[in-house]
Design a protein with these regions (language model features):
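Scaffold/interface architecture of coatomer-like assemblies
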Residues: 1-525
Length: 525
């Protein structure tokens, strides 16, 4: 199953939530696909489910119900690429947004450099203090690599990877003049430009690699948060050479599967061509090189923005660009789109060859209306087939770190606690199920099924603490089944210090391949 998040906006930029399955068409490599899964997601819809508690009026000895975090927002600052001025403006805008953090929200601060990280918390002072420690962490010192000739990563990619001799010769002419070399040294100047391009490319490629690696790690971290999951990628954008296309698609696939929305904020604001920006020094000497660099700067700026747009639109998120009102950008991006759709299709005759499949999504209406459609650009075919055991494991893991409640099996969740001292307590997670309403497979005169029961505890900030899995292999004769009690109770204990916790219970059976997932909360004073 390939999932395609789609945001459809009208001509005023408002997300639409009134479309039906019949309004959409999905094309895989130009071939129309049958949409077999159609979901309309509305902002806040999971919040209502997450607020549900099992024991509304706990008796003495049972668990109380604390406030449950509903939304997790990770501010990911691309300090590898953010110039100081843009970093300060976006940092301050994030700080003003964090000052309005709701009681049921948790925020985290991550950086592409891996420095100055704060995990999910509702401690606004701690978050604000960390923002003030943000710095530009580029691998190269500012101004250290942009020398004579001033070759950008985009130009270096053209020169080294794409063998663009025109750009190389222009860079050689620039080096000849800015280094004060005689005309007959042009060949040497071109070699110097080639060396500088390789140097710039090496540094830029390393920074791109680190950025993708960190973003993948943040998506993986977000997948374990029990609620709405939003990443705000704050970056001027960056160049991503072709070889990183699989990394981009892997990140989008993981984000889609984990219901993680990536919203992108172009921290450059309204982009200005450096060649006409009076606040920036003009480091070029020859007019021809300046014209070429100006053209490449514009193409580079567009390519940088494309990366941010692709991450946002490919995960059902939003992209804020060409706007200096970063406060408004932060306000818009810290929440998901009001509406978005998830379209699922099963590719026919899909080869497990790892090849790229370009996607196109269209929206049709009667009468015809112009829509702005934002959707992922494609996916990569798998390189191996998955088996039933792997699929079951993935389903359970996805359900465990979700807040969506499922009721396909007759299961109830109850929680109790036992406080041994001021520092030690035990949470009892009790799974109650009705065995007579579970599907069994008859074989060798016995009723067979395997139940997988997973209980998990999260702290008050939604951080995963512990999970325990139990497997119940049922092989019962009819006469034994007839004597079963109306309810089975299976208890799982967790040792914790007093505090507030969230509980998640997932139960899956092997025969019906049905699943129930329930939420609970515990407050131990």
């Amino acid at each position: 199953m390939v999932s395609v998040p789609v945001v459809v906006r009208d001509n005023k930029g408002h997300a639409l939530g009134t479309l039906a399955k019949e309004n959409f068409q999905v094309f895989d490599k130009g071939k129309s696909q049958e949409i077999v899964r159609f979901v309309i997601e509305k902002a806040g819809s999971q919040t209502l489910k997450a607020a549900k508690t099992v024991d509304a009026l706990p008796a003495e000895g049972e668990a109380g119900t604390p406030d449950i975090p509903e939304r997790f927002v990770a501010y990911l600052f691309d300090d590898m690429h953010l110039p100081w001025a843009d970093l300060v403006r976006s940092r301050d805008a994030a700080g003003r947004q964090l000052a309005k953090l709701a009681k049921t929200d948790r925020a985290a601060i991550y950086t592409t450099s891996g420095q100055n990280v704060v995990d999910f918390t509702d401690d606004i002072d701690k978050l604000q203090a960390d923002l003030l420690r943000l710095r530009n962490r580029s691998i190269s010192d500012p101004g250290g690599i942009a020398q004579c000739p001033d070759i950008s990563f985009y130009m270096a990619d053209l020169i080294v990877n794409k063998n663009d001799t025109t750009t190389l010769n222009l860079a050689g002419q620039e080096a000849l003049i800015c280094l004060g070399l005689p005309a007959q040294a042009l060949s040497s100047a071109i070699q110097m430009a080639q060396g500088k391009a390789q140097q710039v490319l090496a540094v830029g490629t390393q920074e791109t690699h680190v950025t993708w690696t960190v973003l993948k790690d943040v998506v993986r971290r977000m997948a374990g948060m029990p609620g709405q999951r939003i990443i705000v990628l704050i970056s001027p954008g960056f160049i991503s050479p072709t070889e990183y296309q699989p990394d981009k698609n892997d990140i989008m696939d993981k984000a889609i599967k984990a219901n993680v929305v990536i919203n992108s904020l172009d921290a450059r604001g309204l982009w200005v061509d450096p060649t006409i920006d009076a606040s920036l020094p003009n480091t070029t000497v020859t007019p021809a090189f300046q014209i070429a660099k100006s053209m490449n700067d514009r193409m580079s700026a567009s390519a940088q923005a494309d990366v941010l747009a692709e991450m946002a639109y490919g995960t059902g998120g939003s992209f804020f660009q060409n706007n200096n009102d970063l406060d408004e950008g932060m306000r818009q991006l810290t929440g998901p789109p009001e509406f978005y759709y998830v379209l699922g299709f099963a590719p026919q005759n899909l080869k497990n060859d790892g090849s790229f499949h370009a996607l196109r999504v269209t929206v049709k209406s009667n009468p015809p209306v112009s829509f702005n459609v934002q959707a992922r650009k494609g996916y990569y075919a798998p390189k191996k087939t998955s088996n039933a055991a792997e699929n079951a494991k993935e389903e359970i893991e996805e359900a465990l770190f979700s807040r969506e409640e499922l009721g396909e099996l007759p299961v109830e969740l109850h929680t109790q606690f036992f406080k041994a001292s001021d520092k030690d307590a035990t949470i009892a997670v009790v799974c109650r199920l009705d065995p007579k309403h579970i599907q069994f497979k008859k074989a060798d005169g016995r009723n067979n099924n395997v139940l997988t029961i997973v209980s998990a505890v999260f702290d008050r900030n939604g951080n995963f603490m512990s999970a325990i899995q139990k497997t119940v292999d049922i092989k019962m004769k009819d006469e034994t089944m007839a004597k079963l009690p109306a309810v089975w109770a299976l208890k799982t204990n967790f040792s914790v210090p007093p505090g507030s916790y969230m509980i998640r219970l997932v139960v899956r059976d092997s025969e019906g391949q049905l699943m129930s997932a329930l939420n609970g909360a515990v407050a131990i004073q």
